Amino acid sequence: MTSDLFSLHAPFRPTGDQPTAIASLIESLQGEHKFQTLLGATGTGKTFTMASVIAELGRPTLVLAHNKTLAAQLCNELRQFFPENAVEYFISYYDYYQPEAYIPVTDTYIEKTASINDEIDMLRHSATRSLFERRDVIVVASISCIYGLGIPSQYLKAAVPLQVGAEYDPRLVIRDLVNVQYSRNDVELQRGRFRLKGDVLEIVPAYEDRVIRIEFFGDEVEALRLIDPVSGEILQSLDRISIYPARHFVTPEETLEKACQQIQTEMEQQVAFLEKNNLLVEAQRLSQRTRYDLEMLREVGYCNGVENYSRYLADRQAGEPPECLVDYFPEDWLLVIDESHVTIPQLRGMYNGDQARKKVLIDHGFRLPSAADNRPLKAEEFWQKVKQCVFVSATPGVWEIEQSEARVIEQVIRPTGVLDPEIFVRPTTGQVDDLYGEIQTRVKLKERVLITTLTKRMAEDLTDYFSERGIKVQYLHSEIQSIQRIEILQALRDGEFDVLIGVNLLREGLDLPEVSLVAIMDADKEGFLRAERSLIQTIGRAARHIRGQAILYADNFTDSMQKAIAETERRRKIQQEYNEKHGITPQPINKRANNAILQFLDISRRLNSQQLEEVYEQAQDLPLEKIPDLIQQLEEKMQEAAKKQEFEVAAIYRDRIQHLRDRLLGHKK
């Protein structure tokens, strides 16, 4: 059941209500409806369903995830389903990013500082290159895809085409490469660089880690080869190739000169406005900064903070939305939004947060008003670019359901036959002793327990209480750093302890098949963590275990509780009837080694530079002069992880580096 474009490889066929969901989604999409929702319960194989839909439709697809970790997991799964097709990964390429900001109260200006991850930048370029050269493309992206990404037409036009047998002056080829931001280095060949030795020109494109070798005979291209950068082995001989720019932002010379004139005019107008309002310091600041930037732009075509002039460099009108990743897709592209109930609110919030920061910079003379157009898309601008979309969630939001109208397609039957958890509501009187008994039962069966509380204090108290009674327990809260969170979750799966307590264990994508019991304390206290959607998601953490149960400790039945229980019971009944009809006995889930937690985040086995860990743990007591040395060592580890495409590991190091830099900055203040 696949188109000629995509080749779906799966060790299983659609089962349960997957065939119906796949057929319904395809029918809806072929009927050219803009919005449809896949309401898929935990463990029902939503990713496989979407892979089947993509394969059948045969259209370039953008899969949007609400964080880098889930994007990485989805990308990995889809690459397994589509090994012969282009499954690309597009997330923010910053290892460290401190946006430019100004705090008027303390008169503190914070300059933009950023560290770009070279490997992720390569993957971003690989994504846009694939979109230009083929149709069998799936790009898995985070929300960063709604930020400006140059102009696709200019990017494509600037590519340097080469063909075997054609004639090119090597000097002109080199000039063209320099014009699209490649640099010459005859000693060390890295991504975005080239070298010329005799009649051989070697380039490492922005989207490759392999070398393209161009062999000239006079002005004729005699051979084009793809070379292994380490061994020098010829991997492939090519007939033709296009070398795409080293950066997505490509500005033709004539556009650059026009942009400089427009920047000059706006600066003069804004300086006059500030002076008229007696804001002389701001006027002087703006004039000085902008004149310096203009000088740099005219001399070298670049300046720090060049993105703030993107309205003019991209030749856009005031208020016109920037072109972003979605503009690199052909017209018939498909959008899939994973965990849409989380991703869509995130999509709405990006623009407002960005504009609030920019307004302060503009008002105080740090930036021209046009800097406000260096921004992410507004939600309505994004939807105008979308032709068709599938929302995917176990608990879709009201907005998604309204937009989908009658096209909400359910997928609640698990191929494994595992039922949704049994739910019990028990009074809060004696709840701790009751829970202790339940935990003992689970421990004897070598199963795991999740307990969610409303306060950090209660989580700590419960942890102490159970620990004193011999239960192997740990707790999770917001102050625990990323690396520790991951290590704790891994240790739970490995059986190093049996009970995990936390304030917010509501983690979409949290995949813990060993958990057979979820206990929700204060389930009747209405609020975000005890809303219907949150309760369903939390109860669902036990939905991968054949003996899954959830206990809600409450003295009242809230509306949210009633709805969550009713929905879970409804799904449980559907699965039960299906199992009886088809003679299915629920089977435990045997997750592959590269499951959702471990496939990108196998921290304890890959990070163990134990000494570095111990030094970092004591960083608060380190003399300030030692901090830069520690930062340097962490940066080396970060780059090493990035080279192995262990991007979440690299991100953990990035967060540590940022924490240490913040300490240094705080001291300077």
Swiss-Prot record:
Boundaries of every Helicase C-terminal domain copy: 431-597
Subcellular location: Cytoplasm
Presence of the UniProt keyword Nucleotide-binding in the record: yes
Superkingdom of this protein's organism: Bacteria
Record has Cell division as a keyword: no
Domain UVR: 628-663
Single GO MF annotation: DNA binding
Span(s) of short sequence motif Beta-hairpin: 93-116
Pfam families: Helicase_C, ResIII, UVR, UvrB, UvrB_inter
A Gene Ontology term for the protein's cellular component: excinuclease repair complex
Chief place of localization: cytoplasm
CDD domains attached to this UniProt entry: DEXHc_UvrB, SF2_C_UvrB
Domain Helicase ATP-binding: 27-414
Family: Belongs to the UvrB family.
Quaternary structure annotation from Swiss-Prot or TrEMBL: Forms a heterotetramer with UvrA during the search for lesions. Interacts with UvrC in an incision complex.
Annotated domain remarks: The beta-hairpin motif is involved in DNA binding.
Annotated function: The UvrABC repair system catalyzes the recognition and processing of DNA lesions. A damage recognition complex composed of 2 UvrA and 2 UvrB subunits scans DNA for abnormalities. Upon binding of the UvrA(2)B(2) complex to a putative damaged site, the DNA wraps around one UvrB monomer. DNA wrap is dependent on ATP binding by UvrB and probably causes local melting of the DNA helix, facilitating insertion of UvrB beta-hairpin between the DNA strands. Then UvrB probes one DNA strand for the presence of a lesion.
Misc. remarks from the entry: This bacteria is considerably more resistant to UV and gamma irradiation than E.coli; the E.coli-like SOS regulon model is not an appropriate model for DNA repair in this cyanobacterium.
Protein name (record): UvrABC system protein B
Gene: uvrB
